């Protein structure tokens, strides 16, 4: 079935991810990640609707891309409802461990991207003293813990959607990212 393929979900997610990066680049004035984070720490950022829409779209993309509960249930035993887990059914041992590690690392990258771009507080610079770096690492760990708790609460309070509804779910992310870009073009302050 074509809808169960993880690559199919990734192909739905990619246009939304490109629009999110485009919206962030328009707001920050650059496509460099360090410049985006630097802009987000500046007082000029303020409250912007386009950044809120981009954040919600990126969270939807992260959920779909990592095959979390509304899109896929990692703990299911029904092969017909699996998206990501159907791919790893035939693996065991170290090969399964490597696939699970890759899945965890992808989730870590998305959570780190959301935490460092949208909540850049506590980020230490290279030239600062070791105490500031320790505070930066502590802030990063706290952001990851907060994201983990938020993900756990979200997954326990929402039910898995049908496989045929996944394109609509990802389409919402694309629509929100497009609205973020459109709002940025319409008004410089949004």
Which residue stretches match the model-derived regions?
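Juxtamembrane/interfacial segments at transmembrane-helix boundaries in multi-pass membrane proteins
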Residues: 21-52
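Juxtamembrane inter-helical linkers in multi-pass membrane proteins
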Residues: 73-95
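Juxtamembrane boundary at the C-terminal end of a transmembrane helix
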Residues: 180-190
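Short, small-residue-biased leader/transition segments that mark boundaries at the very start
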Residues: 1-2
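Interfacial loop-to-transmembrane junctions
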Residues: 151-176
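Alpha-helical transmembrane segments
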Residues: 44-65, 133-136
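Transmembrane alpha-helical segments that form the membrane-embedded catalytic/substrate-channel core
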Residues: 56-71, 145-156
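Alpha-helical transmembrane segments of helical membrane proteins, especially in multi-pass transport
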Residues: 92-127, 140-152
